A protein has these predicted regions:
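Bacterial N-terminal signal peptides that target proteins for export
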Residues: 1-8
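Short, ordered, surface-exposed loop/turn motifs in non-cytosolic proteins
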Residues: 64-84, 148-172, 237-257
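Bacterial N-terminal signal peptides
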Residues: 8-15
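Structured interaction patches on ligand/partner-binding surfaces of diverse proteins
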Residues: 23-45, 95, 114-137, 201-224, ...
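Sec/Tat signal peptide C-region and signal peptidase I cleavage site
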Residues: 18-22
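Short, acidic Ser/Thr/Gly-rich low-complexity loop/linker segments typical of extracellular
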Residues: 80-97, 167-183, 252-265
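Short Pro-Gly-centered beta-turn/loop motif in secreted/extracellular proteins
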Residues: 95-107, 114-116, 180-203, 266-277, ...
Length: 316
């Protein structure tokens, strides 16, 4: 059972630079590059060989008219002629914000990454100091979710997957960019539209939305989930203590398909709004009860052994 309504509240705010994680690095698609095992601040193996190497200052900005990014950047400088293995030689690396390198005169490829955004440019170093600014044309996306009444969801059960917006013509699927993004984390992305899948809990509360990221801005998007938390109890009488060692199955009432199975006295789960059937097995006895999940209204479903017992043929 899946909610069909999609409500997305989007707010654009000024983009603030935060440190990017190492796993956010993307490779240049059209170049064969080596993969360094570690990054050292402003290292250049050629600098010590030439005391007259000019200083090259590298800056990165989200847009052409924005201030330089002050953190979270990864810089790699490559030579322009492939080595014997077909890869471009790595000349220097650096992390952080703007960086200053000493490079011998010549041509270089500069590759910059900031989260999932990246850019590359070619520079020509002469005998004089050089300052180069790379424009990333990137922004940020910060995801969250809420219930229909505006209250917060349980963030520890909320996760997002970010996909490319366009469907691949060959596979018929979208390309996954970043899985399992937690709520509240800013993801750095190139400007563009992205397809976001929000999953609340691990069963069937899933909402999709297309969101636009603008360069130089952080897009704050809150997706509305029509779901609630459900706790199951099997009791001998009203007000009784839940029976342990109970095996549970939860069925979609409209299809009869099992959507969750669990064992315990009071299993808890998040379900999309809709109609369901709970089946409990305890010591070879079966019990069954229908229940309804309303968006944003957590509920405890109690099955009494003296009212809801069924034979095995009527359990589903």
């Amino acid at each position: 059972m899946q909610g069909n309504a999609v409500f997305v509240s989007v707010v654009l705010v000024g983009c603030i630079a935060h440190a990017a994680k190492a796993q956010d690095v993307l490779e240049l698609p059209n170049l064969t590059l080596p993969q360094p095992n570690a990054y050292a601040p402003a290292t250049n193996p050629n600098a010590s060989q030439n005391a007259f190497s000019p200083t090259v200052t590298l800056n990165a900005a989200l847009t052409e008219d924005s201030e330089p990014v002050n953190g979270g950047l990864i810089w790699r400088v490559f030579g322009t002629s492939p080595a014997a293995d077909g890869k471009l030689p790595l000349i220097a690396t650096a992390q952080g914000g703007s960086t200053a390198l000493q490079l011998t005169p010549g041509s270089y490829f500069v590759h910059t990454t900031f989260g999932r955004a990246s850019a590359s440019t070619r520079i020509d170093v002469g005998s004089e100091p050089l300052t180069q600014t790379v424009v990333l044309n990137a922004g940020g996306l910060r995801l969250d979710a809420m219930l229909p009444d505006g209250s917060n969801v349980r963030r520890e059960q909320l996760i997002f997957d970010i996909y490319e917006a366009l469907v691949d013509e060959t596979s018929g699927e979208r390309t996954l960019i970043l899985p399992n993004v937690p709520a509240g984390q800013i993801v750095r992305l190139p400007e563009g539209t992205y397809h976001v899948v929000s999953r609340y809990g691990a069963i069937n509360a899933e909402i999709r939305a297309d969101l636009r990221v603008q360069a130089g801005k952080t897009t704050d998007a809150a997706i509305e989930h029509r779901a609630a938390q459900v706790t199951l109890n099997l009791v001998r009488e009203e007000g009784g203590f839940p029976l342990p060692d109970t095996a549970w199955s939860v069925l979609d009432a409209s299809t009869g398909n099992i959507i969750n199975e669990n064992i315990g006295a009071f299993p808890s789960m998040v379900l999309a709004a809709g109609e369901y059937t709970a089946v409990a097995r305890h010591r070879d006895r079966l019990f069954r009860r229908e229940f309804v999940v309303s968006a944003g209204r957590d509920v405890t479903v109690r099955i009494q052994t003296d009212e809801h017992e069924v034979d095995s043929e009527n359990a589903r």
